[in-house]
Structures are given as structure tokens and as C-alpha cells.
Amino acid sequence: MATINPPAGNASAVQTLRDAVRSNEEIHLARGTWIIDDQIDMAGICGKITADVEAIIRLPQNTKREGFLLRNLSKPLVFEPKKVVSETTFKGQEAPFYIINQGNVTIRGADISGIQYGHAISVRNTKDGDECKFVTIANCKIQARQVDERVNADERTTAIAVNGTLEFETGYSSPNRQYVALHKPPRVVKPISYPIITNNDITGGYYAIELSGVHGGHITYNWMKLNTRGLSMQNSSVSNQVRYNNVIDNISAAIHCAYGAVGNIIEFNNIESTRAEGEGLLQAYVGSTGNIFRGNRVSCNTEGDTRPKYMLYCAVDSGSNVFEANYLNGSAKNALIGVESDWSNTINLAYHRSYRASNDDNNMAGDHMRAVSICRNVFRDGTPYRAILLSSVNGKKLSDIYCYGNVIPSGLTNDFIGKENISQVFNVQGF
């Protein structure tokens, strides 16, 4: 192993590191400050990078991207930095660690702070690039700028972003706009497969962990705090396993599936929030089918009109989802459980998701919705006086809603919108 010293006088360390990874199979970053004022292409023969406990990697203020560009590696790479401080406010920043078209990379034990734009760790595929498989992000501590729904999309930060390559229909570049018009999610032409994201401590960011076009991932034992959204699985993310995570004081969805997320397992996670709002804390919507939400523990102490609309939520072309044995303590504004076939702001009922909403999401559904199971869940609060809401609007029928064994506080009632278009409902009082 070669021990490399940082340049004297806070000079740029970019060339020093470029040379080191090309000539050494293992390198160790000595104590001191490592100034990274450009993107470093880390292609070379190096297979392991470690750092002294007093080695600080610093990304200074800049007008261009900075960080480690991990691609075209000759062998698997394990990168174990200690402290990484980002000071840049460049809006085009990607990430201190940018993995693109590259598999078999491990980022472990990094303490990353100061993320103002972009991501802390970004994993991407391009359509014509190499397969990106078996990336591991473990034991990292990440701090990103806190943002909310009102921040423009290009200013939202994400702690860990994993994005496969999507292909949209001609004329569309947004999953939401394509689904409204065509009722189909984007196609994944190059997924990112089998990532492992485990035991990370994440504070802030619009998303703590964002999965888009990801297949077969394992997301476990992470702490996500003060995020707008904790964990998002979108854009045809398939067969991911999300277990034993903690989502604390999120604003919007804690864990959600959307736009073609299929066959994901979300179980044994802990969610606690005193500031949650939005649709629901656990949710599958907009073309998300066959997902299982099981054994999760959810506590929401938000009060008044800022409460989330639902605790569990399933809507819009999202059949065959299972909500089983979840423990939910707290209240929601509209109903504890919401199952809705479509959205329409013409429905003049405050407990419908799109009540007084914009026209943007009207008529989102492309088909009828069926086969939602809500079984053996435990609810521990008496508000909002509505336990289960079943809603059929815009002629999109709702059927085969199977409920059994739920423990619901006494005094709660169930409610229905478009009851004439709802059928095959089992064990829902009042139907």
C-alpha cells in the first residue's frame, strides 16, 4: 500500500490523486487537507483507497463540478474516505462521489457534509454504458441541505441517488406528465441492478434515498432524518427489498412506490414524524402494483390541517398491493386507509385526495383498479373518525378489496365515494 501525502499549502490534490490511482493498486490518504477542485477520473489500477482519520477531503466553492468520478475501472474498487466537506454552491454539481456505468464499487465509512446541490453519492447508468451492478454504500454519515416541496426540482438535494436510464415516449420527459397523458410509466432501458445501501445515517435532503429504474436492491438498516421524503422507489423500480430502516420526521411520504414500481417488499421499517403532511406515510400509487408493505411501525403526531391525508395510501392503477400487519399510531386528515381508483378535483369532498387541487393530476388512471389487500393492521388513534375510504371516480371502477383482521379504534366509520362503481369488497363495515 502506498501512502500519499496531500500537496502543501492547500494546493489542488487533483493531479496527485490522478497519478496515484494509475500507478498503485492500493493507496492510503495521509492526514491533512485534500483539495478537490475538479472532477477526478479515477480510472486506473487502484482497487482500494483508505484514509487517515485526520485526512479531510474538501470540495471548495467553485463554478464547475467537483468530486470523484468512478468509471472505467480495471477492477472492483473499495473507497473508504473519512471526512468529506463540500463547500460548493454550484447548481450543476453532481456529487462528491459519482459512479457512472460502473459496477463493483463500494463506498464505505464516509462522513459527507455540506451538500447544497445535487447529491452526496450518485449512481447512474447511461443507455450505451456498461452495466452498473453490485454497488455498495455502507456505514456513511451524510448531511444535506433541507428542502421542501416548494423548492424547484433542480434545487432539490438527495443524499443517495441511484438512477437507471429511462426512455420516455416521444414528446415527454417527465414521468408524471407522461402518465397523465398516456397512462404508462417510463421504460427502463438500462437498470441499475443489485445495489446495497445499508447502515447509513442521513440527515436532510429532499430525498434521503432515491431509486429510479433500480432492480433487485437491498436497502436496510438506514437512518433517514429531517428529509422531505425518506425513501422513494419510482420509474419502474422492481423487486427491491426495503427492511429495518428508520425514517424520522419526514415531511411528505416516508416510503413510497410510484410510476411503475412493481414487486417491491417494504417491511419491518420504523417511521416516526411530528411534521408529516402530503398523501400518505406508506403509499403505492400511479401504476405501482404487486408491492408488499408488511410489519412496518408508523407513528405520526402532526396536528391540525397539516397532517398527512392518509396513513396508508393506494391509488391510481395500483392493484395487487398488500398492506399487512402494520402498526400505526397517530392520525390522518382524510382517513387512516385510502384506496382510490383515480383523482379528480371536481369531487367536492374534502376527504378525496384531489379536493381543491390543481388540474394537473386529473384523470391520471388508465384502467380500473382491483385486488388490494388490507389485513391485520393495528391502528391506535380515534381521529379522523374515518377508518377506510374507498373511492371510485372518473368511471374507474374499484373492486376486490379484501380486508380482514384489522384492529381499528371504536367509533370510526368507513366512507365511500362513487359507491355504485365499487364491488367485491370484503369485511368493510357499511359497504
Short names for language-model regions:
Residues 1-16, 33:
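Right-handed parallel beta-helix/beta-solenoid
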Residues 15-28, 32-431:
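Extracellular parallel beta-helix/beta-solenoid repeat domains
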